[in-house]
Amino acid sequence: MWLIRAIVPVRYLGSYKRPQKPPWMRNPVVFYSDFSEKKGKVAPLQETRMRDRFTLYARGGEGGSGCSSVRRSRADRYGKPDGGNGGRGGDVILECTHAVWDFSGLQPHIKGGKAGHGTSKNRIGNRGEDKVLLVPIGTVIHLQEGEIPSQVENESPKDLDPWDLPGSLVEDPASEENSDVHQETMSESDQDDTEQESLTRQLGMPKEADFEDDDEEIDQIRYNVAELTQQGQRVIIARGGEGGLGNVSATRYVRGSKFAKSTIRQTNLRSMEDDAEEDDERSSIKAGLLGSEAVLILELKSIADVGLVGMPNAGKSTLLGALSRAKPRVGHYAFTTLRPNLGNVNYDDFSMTVADIPGLIKGAHQNRGLGHNFLRHIERTKVLAYVVDLASGLDGCEGLTPWQQLRDLVMELEFHEEGLSDRSSLIVANKIDEEGAEERLKELKRRVKGVKIFPVCAVLEEGVAELKDGLKMLVDGNGEPSERLKLENICVD
């Protein structure tokens, strides 16, 4: 009977028909668009450029505060202090490696990890996490504001005791009686002033700074304060703040004077603990210090033995591919290379690095074309290889003659830095396979003196073996006087 009563309502509800969907939902509208999902080809000059100059703001992590705690027991009614010291803040470290080649992966603001606070049972706070930034080999550090970076020694900073604050627990109490009494009788206002001064000295921080990446020179920059030229080399650019003292260490410090001993006889530790808790925020002993701050300008100067310098579309990238296993981007238009490319040329008992520098034009020192900022990458090179286009200006075509190209290249190097062209040099006469290039080569040898000229065809790899031997002789040196291309040795008229 009860089963029939349960089935009847279910049948009654099932008699209702489900609402049908409206026609516009049964037949959805299909939208069409003329927009193609296929992405268009990116223009050549829209390629991401190399970021070889970067402004970095670094700040060390904050130190942890000391703990104010009391351990009580049946035998000790008032208890004993057992608060631990705060941990030391994390550092900001720069490490050079072959894994990166520019500063595109860096963030403009970086801060070390915050340290942990001390806890009861005399436990020390955790040390802040170090922030390690990877930079390419050849990074030069310019200091705008802050402390000078220091090189990391073999001993890691993590091995140091975080409670090892300079001049706190290692002093002889007997030799500092007068100073201890003076510290105990200081007023609260004097303590606040001392705390503020100590924090200011510890920070060494700028008040206001513009952290955008400009090309403008700043007046108060300390140039070349540090360089990273070896794999795995590390430099600390911002140190973490020291941790504050817990009431265990603070009590030991107070007990070091005779005045404090007489005071302790009259007052118990509980009253001292209450006073310490009330002045916790104002106490410079128990509060952790802030980390140091610095504003740095990072600049990349690639380390290469040979620098390929030439006008746009002279065939430098193709030549680099013929000399080494590098695969730079090659195109039939000017300014194909937007970033320096590096390649290794290996011999049986010798190896050297060749850098392909983006093309230079006349007036590059006035920021024409790609400018001359990339020339900093050849400041460390031993040899300059001037790559000229023999086919330029032939048969009424537009372009400069090879000797005019050499004159403009030497002038742009000197405009960038005086004496930059005064190093071992040779000339690479590229595109020797073009019609009329042989006569142009003879004219080039007549107009340019004092430097060896190597005719090559980078596409067909003709003359590349002789060029490798010439580069090896200049890089290796062997005590022989090197040849230098000078402006007075180029006859243009």
From Swiss-Prot:
InterPro entries: G_OBG, GTP-bd, GTP-bd_Obg/CgtA, GTP1_OBG_dom, GTP1_OBG_dom_sf, OBG_GTPase, P-loop_NTPase. GO terms for cellular component: mitochondrion. The keyword rRNA processing does not apply. Residues 304-476 form the OBG-type G domain. One of its GO terms (molecular function) is GTP binding. Its main location: mitochondrion. Keywords: GTP-binding, Mitochondrion, Nucleotide-binding, Transit peptide. Residues 65-89, 146-215 are annotated as: Disordered. Residues 187-196 have a biased composition (Acidic residues). CDD domains: Obg. Belongs to the TRAFAC class OBG-HflX-like GTPase superfamily. OBG GTPase family. May bind GTP and have GTPase activity. This is Probable GTP-binding protein OBGM, mitochondrial. It comes from Arabidopsis thaliana. The lineage of its organism: Eukaryota, Viridiplantae, Streptophyta, Embryophyta, Tracheophyta.
